[in-house]
Amino acid sequence: MAELGLNEHHQNEVINYMRFARSKRGLRLKTVDSCFQDLKDSRLVEETFTIDEVSEVLNGLQAVVHSEVESELINTAYTNVLLLRQLFSQAEKWYLKLQTDISELENRELLEQVAEFEKAEFVSSSKKPIIDITKPKLVPINEGGTTELLNKEILRLQQENEKLKSRLKTIEIQAVNALDEKSKLERVLQDLQLDQENQQDLLKAQDLDDLENTVATLRSEFQKTLNDKTENQKSLEENLAAAKHDLLRVQEQLSMAEKELEKKFQQTAAYRNMKEILTKKNDQIKDLRKRLAKYESED
């Protein structure tokens, strides 16, 4: 393990990147230096300058330096993105997911460690052999142990993934079939409910017709009975009135007969005749009373 906590291979990769960054940084610094040198050669030819002239010179220099520094910072950011892309692409080939901690990029202690590492590596760079900057690709290592276990685990996960996909497809088919069956059953249920409602409506209509017919029959019978009773009552009333008239007539005749009897009481033959008449009248009265009592009881 080296100063950065990396193995030798990865440390060499870091050194190559730092060499690349130092080279780009040196070029940009030379560009900035040339900006100042050009300014000296082209503008600082007079012995004295006015305030406006000094301001103009400094503003021009500021614009040039600002452009160069901004370009370098942008280029550095893009370069770092490309470097991360290479690392992530190689990790994805091994089904790995790398994570970064952005907050560590501003860790002052770690930055100082990197500075010390750069100083140790490049201050005496003339005494060290130049390392080949060609970056080797991260290729699978044909060794046992961890690599073999990782390959087996990847293969097992792939097989399990295929099984899960197959099972998911089967479940989806079953779910679709179940939904179709549910839809069919719902349609059948709706049809049955509709038929039941129609039958209930038909039965209700039939029951209503039967009830109306029954009510009509009962009403007709009641009206007939009422009419018969009315006619019978009318007949009884007529018979009663006739009987009363007959009774009054007989009573009148009886009264007349009694008066006549008093006149002819001394006449024996007449008396006998009158007695016979009186007896007959009494019999008629009894008969009429019986008839009258019978009619009154029926009423």
From Swiss-Prot:
Q: What is the disulfide pattern of this chain?
A: none
The induction annotation reads: In hippocampus, up-regulated by exercise training.
Q: In which tissues is it expressed?
A: Highly expressed in testis. Expressed in brain, cerebellum, eye, heart, kidney, liver, lung and trachea. In small intestine, graded expression along the crypt-villus axis with high levels in the villus apex and lower levels in the crypt stem cells (at protein level). Not expressed in skeletal muscle and white adipose tissue.
Q: Which GO terms describe its molecular function?
A: identical protein binding; protein-containing complex binding
Keywords attached to this entry: Coiled coil, Cytoplasm
Q: Does the keyword Cytoplasm apply?
A: yes
- Principal cellular location given in the protein's record: cytoplasm
Location of the protein in the cell: Cytoplasm
Give the UniProt entry's GO cellular component terms. cilium; cytoplasm; cytosol; manchette
Q: Where is this region: Interaction with BSS9?
A: 145-299
Can you tell which superkingdom this protein's organism belongs to? Eukaryota
Task: Supply one GO BP term.
Answer: negative regulation of protein localization to ciliary membrane
Q: State the coiled-coil residue ranges.
A: 96-299
Identify its protein family: Belongs to the LZTFL1 family.
Subunit structure, briefly? Self-associates. Interacts with BBS9; the interaction mediates the association of LZTL1 with the BBsome complex and regulates BBSome ciliary trafficking.
- Role this protein plays: Regulates ciliary localization of the BBSome complex. Together with the BBSome complex, controls SMO ciliary trafficking and contributes to the sonic hedgehog (SHH) pathway regulation. May play a role in neurite outgrowth. May have tumor suppressor function.
User: What is the protein name stated in its UniProt record?
Assistant: Leucine zipper transcription factor-like protein 1
Q: Which organism is it from?
A: Mus musculus (Mouse)
